[in-house]
Curated annotation (Swiss-Prot):
The lineage of its organism: Eukaryota, Metazoa, Chordata, Craniata, Vertebrata. This is DNA polymerase delta subunit 3. It comes from Bos taurus. There is a cross-link at residues 259, 433 (Glycyl lysine isopeptide (Lys-Gly) (interchain with G-Cter in SUMO)). Accessory component of both the DNA polymerase delta complex and the DNA polymerase zeta complex. As a component of the trimeric and tetrameric DNA polymerase delta complexes (Pol-delta3 and Pol-delta4, respectively), plays a role in high fidelity genome replication, including in lagging strand synthesis, and repair. Required for optimal Pol-delta activity. Stabilizes the Pol-delta complex and plays a major role in Pol-delta stimulation by PCNA. Pol-delta3 and Pol-delta4 are characterized by the absence or the presence of POLD4. They exhibit differences in catalytic activity. A motif (PIP-box) lies at residues 456-463. Keywords: Acetylation, Cytoplasm, DNA damage, DNA excision, DNA repair, DNA replication, Isopeptide bond, Nucleus, Phosphoprotein, Ubl conjugation. The keyword Nucleus applies.
């Protein structure tokens, strides 16, 4: 009955819980000896395969036996899958035992899951790990906690094992390894002993030299890296300093140029005025002091090259300050004829000024229609639209003149007077047209041309007011 109960437990672990059941895990879980756990697993596999030949069970076996390797006999213990069991048995010279190690539903690719299952169960039963084991040793007694702590300290204080010793330990298999060369306890005497000692000393010196050379190479590489880094930072610092110096030089040069421009802008005004005021006196003095004048001319030529930009700026500013005359678009409306009336007549509203300016302040009158006579044969007074100039200051503070059409009443006598005034106005108009040519000649004649233009505008305004 007990065996049947155990088999039911194993079936529940494998099929229902889908666990990997090893003989160690089963012995700790059920509290049975390891040999009994191995027998239980074997019985479960046999019964399950007899009942259902298509049952999905994967079994791993623990195989042990003697093996001859490199001419030496050794004892081998291996965990293999069921499909590789016969191949491993054939390699063994003598097969000592074959036991069921684990049962699981899935095929295992490696031994990792088996190790994890045994590791977890052993960790939980670490104090009683040999309770259900088949290996027993009466001399193996658990140590006291004080002794265990002292042994741990001694292990920490022991010097570490050299890698050469570790390599020699790894090469040994089951106590058999390559023969270790025995060191000669007695040194050879005479000449052979001298040569042997010299060879040993040379080998030691060679090892020391290789170590020192390796250290020197490492140190030289580090020094080179440090030198490269220091050189890089020094070059960067030099570049930043050069950039700062260039910026300071540019700022100083710009400040000096601004100062020179301010100094140079003042003398041209004072120099041009006396030239315009008294050109005859300058001609007389130039004849008397020709050698001195030649030197001054050379200096002036140099200055003129520098002041050309400033003078162009001044002329542009002067042009902006000149009066801007705006002429309205030509109106094609006919003159209106209005009969005489004793009361005062109302003037028509002026048309808006056009945007296109023109420098000609010439009065323009529309063509006069033939005089209209009344029924009594008397001439009637007629109104006429006349172009008149109006001056005002704009937002920038400049004087602006605009031409506006205004209606005026006129008779035959007034028409004759206006024809005369128009003949008087014509010569100033020609003078106004010549202004741009005079401006092109140079900045020296610009001020004189400005004065003439102002006088002509004033004269035309005076005649229009009459």
């Amino acid at each position: 009955m007990a065996d049947q109960f155990y088999l039911e437990n194993i079936d529940e672990f494998v099929t229902d819980q889908n666990k990997i059941v090893t003989y160690k895990w089963l012995s700790y879980t059920l509290g049975v000896h390891v040999n009994q756990a191995k027998q239980m697993l074997y019985d479960y596999v046999e019964r399950k395969r007899k009942e259902n030949s298509g049952a999905q069970l994967h079994v791993t076996y623990l195989v042990s036996g003697s093996l001859i390797q490199n001419g030496h006999s050794c004892h081998k213990v291996a965990v293999v899958r069921e499909d590789k069991l016969e191949a491993v048995k054939s390699k063994l010279a003598v097969t000592a035992s074959v036991h069921v190690y684990s049962i699981q539903k899935a095929m295992l690719k490696d031994s990792g899951p088996l190790f994890n299952t045994d590791y977890d169960i052993l960790k939980s039963n670490l104090q009683n790990c040999s309770k259900f084991s088949a290996i027993q040793c009466a001399a193996a007694v658990p140590r006291a906690p004080a002794e265990s702590s002292s042994s741990e300290k001694l292990e920490q204080s022991d010097p570490p094992v050299s890698p050469e010793m570790q390599a020699s330990d790894e090469l040994t298999t089951n106590g058999h390894g390559p023969p270790v060369p025995k060191q000669s306890s007695q040194q050879p005497k005479g000449i052979m002993g001298m040569f042997a000692s010299k060879a040993a000393s040379k080998a030691q010196d060679a090892n020391k030299e290789t170590k020192t050379e390796a250290k020197e190479v490492m140190n030289s590489e580090k020094n080179n890296e440090n030198l490269l880094l220091s050189g890089y930072w020094e070059s960067m610092i030099v570049l930043f300093q050069a950039q700062c110096i260039n910026k300071l030089k540019v700022n100083l040069d710009s400040e000096q140029e601004v100062k020179e421009e301010k100094k140079v802008e003042q003398p041209p005004l004072s120099v041009t005025e006396p030239k315009l005021a008294a050109p005859v006196d300058l001609k007389k003095s130039s004849k008397k002091a020709e050698p001195v004048r030649m030197q001054q001319k050379e200096k002036k030529r140099r200055k003129q090259m520098e002041l050309s930009d400033d003078e162009t700026k001044e002329t542009e500013n002067m042009k902006k300050k000149r009066r801007r005359i705006k002429l309205p678009e030509s109106d094609s409306s006919e003159d209106e004829v209005i009969p005489d009336s004793p009361g005062a007549y109302e003037a028509e509203s002026p048309s808006p000024p056009p945007p296109s300016p023109s420098p000609e302040p010439v009065l323009k009158t529309e063509p006069e229609p033939p005089p209209v006579k009344g029924s009594d044969g008397e001439n009637k007074r007629k109104r006429k639209r006349v172009l008149k100039s109006k001056t005002f200051t704009d937002e920038e503070g400049c004087m602006v003149t605009e031409k506006v059409y205004e209606s005026e009443s006129c008779t035959d006598s007034e028409e004759e007077l206006k024809m005369k005034t128009s003949s008087v106005h014509r010569p100033p108009a020609m003078a106004v047209k010549k202004e741009p040519k005079e401006e092109r000649k140079g900045p020296k004649k610009g001020t004189a041309a400005m004065g003439k233009a102002n006088r002509q505008v004033a004269i035309t305004g005076f005649f229009q007011r009459k």
